[in-house]
């Protein structure tokens, strides 16, 4: 399995609550509806918890730190091969999701990358 990680920053005019509500209640169903055609095996939203003083503590610990992301999307696929291709249905689903992402994500400041997990501690460890 391969995982797409998308570190999200909200559009500047949105509050954290507005961003997270839109992501959870509007965008998530769009992803779920397109999961089969896109061959998404798993989709997880990681929502930032805004705890007073926590970011300042992290900045102090790390000797400075950029502003945290507003959330992280994690999408699992069987392989890179299923993510591309010339299938019009796949291209259409990708375009629809990208169009919706522009409604709530600051896309130029939200990096994404492909990753492979190496579990160190967890339930599946033997």
Which functions belong to the PLM regions below?
Residues 1-126:
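Macromolecular interaction modules
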């Amino acid at each position: 399995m391969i995982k797409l990680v998308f570190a999200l920053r909200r559009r500047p005019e949105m509050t954290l609550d507005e961003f997270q509500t839109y992501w959870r209640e509007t965008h998530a169903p769009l992803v779920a509806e397109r999961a089969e055609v896109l061959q998404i095996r798993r989709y997880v939203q990681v929502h930032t918890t805004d705890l007073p003083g926590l970011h300042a503590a992290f900045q102090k610990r790390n000797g400075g730190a950029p502003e945290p992301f507003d959330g992280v999307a994690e999408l699992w696929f069987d392989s890179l091969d299923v993510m591309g291709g010339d299938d019009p249905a796949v291209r259409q689903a990708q375009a629809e999701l990208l169009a919706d992402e522009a409604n709530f994500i600051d896309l130029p400041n939200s990096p994404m990358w492909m990753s492979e997990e190496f579990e160190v501690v967890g339930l599946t460890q033997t």
